[in-house]
Design a protein with these regions (language model features):
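Terminal, low-structured helical/coil segments at or just beyond the last alpha-helical repeat
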Residues: 173-201
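C-terminal segment of N-terminal export signals and the immediately downstream linker at the start
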Residues: 22-62
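Ankyrin-repeat boundary/"N-cap" motif
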Residues: 54-67, 88-104, 123-130, 151-165, ...
Length: 201
């Protein structure tokens, strides 16, 4: 049987535990936070070394912005007012599943949020163009590289998925994508939430 801890030993352990971040991801017990994968170079280092003169954006702030940009335009704008550099910040949800606020709004079919983000300088991509019904842009991208028909956006969502969630405004894009590669499309779970409900008169 182990000897009982002295008061001094107990106090030392308690103080040390207070300095260790909780594995529960904060007081609300939201689960463990992100963990960076282990890595060691097995190739020569690049000849250029970053100076890191400016601090990186806070990861929690980036996470919150990207999440709000999926469905809450007011909060997205509020966070952009607080930190304009969030507009093109990307969150790695794990294993290289990168997502920006624009990517989140796009795969949710939220044209209203996409328009806000574009006004703030978000970098439009092929997935956003597909959702917005920008047929010429999608055609140009696929002409540049036909294999982009199989490209995956945030969470693995395809170009077809983005065109589908765009609804009627992107039917032409979806028809074009289907003419290149016919997919058996399942009902899009985000289509019903693509636009906010209109207030009752």
């Amino acid at each position: 049987m182990n000897d009982p801890l002295s008061r001094r030993e107990f106090a030392s352990l308690w103080a040390g535990a207070a300095l260790v971040p909780s594995a529960q991801g904060g007081p609300e017990g939201a689960g463990p936070g992100p963990v960076e994968a282990a890595f060691e170079r097995d190739y020569p280092a690049p000849g250029f070394a970053p100076s890191w003169k400016k601090p990186q954006l806070n990861r929690l702030l980036v996470q919150d912005f990207v999440i709000h940009a999926h469905s809450d335009p007011e909060m997205a704008e509020k966070l952009l007012a607080k930190e304009p550099a969030l507009i093109n910040a990307a969150m790695d949800w794990g294993a290289g599943d990168w997502e920006t606020g624009l990517g989140g709004a796009s795969h949710m079919g939220r044209r209203d949020i996409v328009e806000v983000l574009l006004r703030h300088g978000a970098r439009i991509d092929l997935f956003c163009a597909a959702m917005m019904g920008l047929l010429d842009a999608v055609k140009a991208g696929l002409a540049l590289e036909p294999k982009l028909i199989d490209a995956k956006g945030p969470h693995g969502f395809s170009l077809h998925f983005h065109a589908q969630v765009g609804g009627k405004d992107s039917e032409g894009v979806l028809d074009h994508l289907q003419s290149i590669k016919k997919l058996d499309l399942k009902p899009n779970p985000f289509l019903k939430s693509a636009m906010p409900a209109k207030p009752k008169a």
